[in-house]
UniProtKB/Swiss-Prot annotation:
SUPFAM superfamilies: ATP synthase (F1-ATPase), gamma subunit. The gene is atpG. Pfam families: ATP-synt. InterPro entries: ATP_synth_F1_ATPase_gsu (IPR035968), ATP_synth_F1_gsu (IPR000131), ATP_synth_F1_gsu_CS (IPR023632). Keywords: ATP synthesis, Cell membrane, CF(1), Hydrogen ion transport, Ion transport, Membrane, Transport. This is ATP synthase gamma chain. It comes from the Bacteria. The keyword ATP-binding does not apply. It comes from Renibacterium salmoninarum (strain ATCC 33209 / DSM 20767 / JCM 11484 / NBRC 15589 / NCIMB 2235). GO terms for cellular component: plasma membrane; proton-transporting ATP synthase complex. Belongs to the ATPase gamma chain family.
Amino acid sequence: MGAQLRVYRQRIKSTQSMGKLFKAMELIATSRISKARSRVQASLPYANAITRAVSVVASQSEIHHPLTTEPEQILRAAVLVLTSNRGLAGSYSASVLKQAEQLNTLLQADGKEVKTYLVGNKAQAYFQFRNRSFTKAWVNPTDAPEFATAQEISKTLLEDFAEEFEKDGVDEIHVVYTRFKSMVVQEPTVIRLLPLEVSEEEVSESSDLLPLYEYEPEPEAVLDALLPRYIEARIFNVMLQAAASELAARQRAMKSASDNARDLVKKFTRLANTARQAEITQELSEIVAGADSLNAS
């Protein structure tokens, strides 16, 4: 067997093996997406209900709570960045990190100091490779988030938000994540988590669904109880959307890799056939030449 033909056959074999691996990873991601989407949908009723409740209490009671009051001057901002633990998900993590860098630039241009909190190995590796500091990182499974992790993140952010500036506290909290819209569309998104912003539209919708309340205890105590749960619900919903987006991105990336592997196998097969035909032609030519030499002698 010719050297060139042997190389092509080795490439066909290795590409077929990689193609099987990519196909298996595509099927695994596909099977897990439905569960991830179900978890996103299951988290929405509670998240929407507590958002409406907080909006109504904050707007109708006319109180000034630290978590809902805009500070006179914002000197330090916290940014929570959600990426994946593993690769093979296309540009999923890179897109989130790009969005985080843009937000970082905007905040610093406004004269704000930035404290960064990370979720996922990809974000941690990105910052460590560039020798950039971050406050804290969580590397729990990003494609199957747990509520306990959301509670831990919420507690950390709320504690820093409650601290004074001189004690390394923050004045506002932003979250950078990938919003899951559909299997085809996942959008890197930035939201400001705190101070809580209550839009007129939210208040109007909430007023239609929730009556005016008489508060016992005082509205401040109600908000003290509701707001931590609101933050936990928002962060958990964000983590679930990021997980669904990660799996969708990985499914697309593995499908593309599987298709490319199949195309490469076809290409190498054609090249191997061409090389084999050339080898056979050369052998026939040598046989004919040898026969002619014998006849001539």
